[in-house]
Amino acid sequence: MNRKTMAAVTAMLTSSASALAAPPATTPDQPMPVNPHTDRAALQRFADDRLGVMFHWGPAVLRNQEISWSMSDRAKYESVYKDFNPKHFDANAWAAVAKAAGAKYVVYVCKHHDGFCMWDTRTTTNNIMNTPFHRDVVAELSAACARDGLMFGTYLSIMDIHEDKWNRCYAARTQMPGYPQGLPHIATFTADQTAELLTKYNSQMMWYDGAWLQGWRQSDGPAKVEAVIRADNPKAIITRLGNDVDDYECMEARIGTYRAVPWEMVTSVAYPTYSFNTHIKYKPASFFIETLSRVVCGNGNLLLNFVPDADGAIPPEQQTIAADMGGWLKANGEAVYGTRGGPYYPNTWGGTTHEGNRLFVFVLPDAPDTLTLPPCGRKLVSLRYLTHIEPPNVTQTDAGLTVTVPKDIRGSDTTVLELTMDGDLTGMVEASRPKTPVKIKQNGVPAPIEERTLPTTAPAR
């Protein structure tokens, strides 16, 4: 149903004049984070984008095991570097997969914990230019993203097993043997590599890993690296560097409840696997469409990792996931891009987003047929499904909005309704806040993604 025919369904609405007599209790919209160095416009654009794609790929893929974490002997692990010469790496093809998925930004793992650098760096000889491949992957992918209008971001591990001269990857902080050259060296080394990624490759996002290193958060390392970022690219946004320097919080494989400030969830098409092996098991696209739906209703972004194979190609199964997600977003993207979560808190059945006076209701496949939303202080003017021509069944009374979406209307993916109200939607409807933690399922089974409660206001800095 197009906008011109919206008015045709308004006659189906029933409303009570007294429904708006007393405004509902709402929580006011919260400000953006108060870090004085944050570029607010850049962070707003990030929040508008809602979906990003990540790529883990490097010589370690030849081991057919997880990157870094499979390292039990550094010499054996690093011996594969001399054989790395993939035949089918094409940065344009990678960018095309991100574009097909509906992503607006790309984050590439330029250096994982193993310390191997996928760019032409002056900081170490442990880099891609000293392999038979001898191509600057970061440069090629940055250029491909620019051509496709994708924001380019760079993942950089603070932990560097090669530079730290450790013999293996340590999963527990208590097992780590310390740093031969001390934390100041790690901070300087990380800052120098950060400067290269910002100035040579126009990185717009610095996405760190390894801030859990023993002593890192207690050192001046985060502040030292932040100073480089703010000087070299003040518009770049930062996450996972540690302490109070981050512009937003990113959580791994956890769906947060609603949070007023920007946040991100990162997971993989083959979670818990992030780099390619021949035993990978993929989740279906419907799983990630539902994940994206839950995340955006909680006012967050989803960063979805894809895993190119040893030859540099993205396997067909992953391309199918990207195409299916992109197809859903093509039909429902106006409920995702540029919107904000709320004004209803996410629940087991789904949640809502809004933009101006437009309320988008995300109804998950396993939701009950009928939902009741408490009064939001606005009168319903018109409504439609984003993907069906049938007029929705929605009524408005003193009790709020009653939304009925029969299962024969729904498919295997989230169904979205657009409800146009008589004024802009602001704040959160307190009556919709779940009284107990939300227990979620995905595709009818308990999700391996855990609910995590987040503060609803910006953290004190």
Residue ranges and their predicted role:
Residues 9-17:
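Bacterial N-terminal signal peptides
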